[in-house]
UniProtKB/Swiss-Prot annotation:
UniProt-listed Enzyme Commission number(s): 3.1.1.73
CC terms in the record's Gene Ontology section: extracellular region
Family according to the record: Belongs to the AB hydrolase superfamily. FaeA family.
Catalytic reaction equation(s): feruloyl-polysaccharide + H2O = ferulate + polysaccharide
Presence of the UniProt keyword Cell inner membrane in the record: no
Entry-linked CDD domains: Lipase_3
Source taxon at top rank: Eukaryota
Protein name: Probable feruloyl esterase A
Active site per the UniProt annotation: 154, 215, 268
Keyword Disulfide bond: yes
GO biological-process terms attached to the record: lipid metabolic process; xylan catabolic process
Keyword field: Carbohydrate metabolism, Disulfide bond, Glycoprotein, Hydrolase, Polysaccharide degradation, Secreted, Serine esterase, Signal, Xylan degradation
Pfam families cross-referenced by the UniProt entry: Lipase_3
Length: 281
């Protein structure tokens, strides 16, 4: 028995409270396929990009020894995309970043007025900012017609979100896919992401915040410390498929965050049947 409540119970709760409009069942086959493809790349980042599609090549490595932030800038010529992917937590050094909940002003993005982000992840961002911006600019200059895609899982998801917000000041063709993303910033930051990427409009969004059953990491850091999720949540329940994806508006509706998951659990490390770094897909 899965450790999350049935959708029937969820829909009943919503009809009695916030209303059925808060949750929509099902997404298109194309959107689902794209989400799974990005999950594959994000999970492969734990194992040096094992088993990623053959159309994707590496344009450069992202790495900082002090923070152990790892990632790559990739290029998919078949789709005309420049893809930035960040690895999730893979070391005690990363864990220290994870648990630094002190919010930091988002000073590198002055356009984001009043914005504050997760202190540990901001330290991570500062440590690789020049690398990321340099590699992306290099590729964007060589391939000006290519769009940008940014993705990651767990810590890598928050890194992807912060990176996307930062790069949005320079580029306007960014799409973001995050998996098991912790809460990454305050209300001002969440509102900035929502507006920039139309994250609350499923018909136009450029930001897909994907969760899985009772993944415990999206419950962290707690809202009591001023953290708020951005945008529409794309909640995946089992068995996996486009009709078992639910679009959940807002931060605290009855989807992933309401399922009682705590911290790193099975639902966090496995997305769409792919375990982080397992390379068995």
């Amino acid at each position: 028995m899965k450790n999350f409540v049935s959708m029937h119970a969820i829909l009943l709760a919503c009809s009695a409270g916030a209303g059925l409009a808060a949750i929509t069942q099902g997404i298109s086959e194309g959107t689902y396929s794209r989400i799974v493809e990005m999950a594959t790349i994000s999970q492969a980042a734990y194992a040096n990009l094992c088993n990623i599609p053959s159309t994707i090549t590496s344009a450069g490595k992202i790495y900082n020894a002090e923070t152990d932030i790892n990632g790559w800038v990739l290029r998919d010529d078949s789709r005309q995309e420049i893809i930035t992917v960040f690895r999730g937590t893979g070391s005690d050094t990363n864990l220290q970043l994870d648990t630094n909940y002190t919010q930091a002003p988002f000073d590198t993005l002055p356009q984001c007025s009043g914005c504050a982000v997760h202190g540990g992840y901001y330290v991570g961002w500062i440590s690789v900012k020049d690398q990321v911006e340099g590699l992306v600019q290099q590729q964007a200059s060589q391939y000006p017609d290519y769009s940008l895609v940014i993705t990651g899982h767990s810590l890598g998801a928050s890194m992807a979100a912060i990176t996307a917000a930062q790069l949005s000041a320079t580029y306007n063709n960014i799409t973001v896919y995050t998996f098991g993303e912790p809460r990454t910033g305050n209300q001002a930051y969440a509102s900035y992401v929502d507006e920039t990427f139309q994250a609350t409009n499923p018909d136009a969004t450029k930001f897909y915040r994907v969760t899985h059953t009772n993944d415990g990491i999206p419950n962290l850091p707690p809202t009591s410390q001023g953290y708020v999720h951005h945008g529409t949540e794309y909640w995946s329940v089992e068995p996996h498929g486009p009709q078992n994806m639910y679009l959940c508006l807002g931060d605290e509706v009855q989807c992933c965050e309401a399922q009682g998951g705590q911290g790193v659990n099975d639902a966090h490390v496995t997305y769409f049947g792919m375990a982080s770094g397992a390379c068995t897909w």
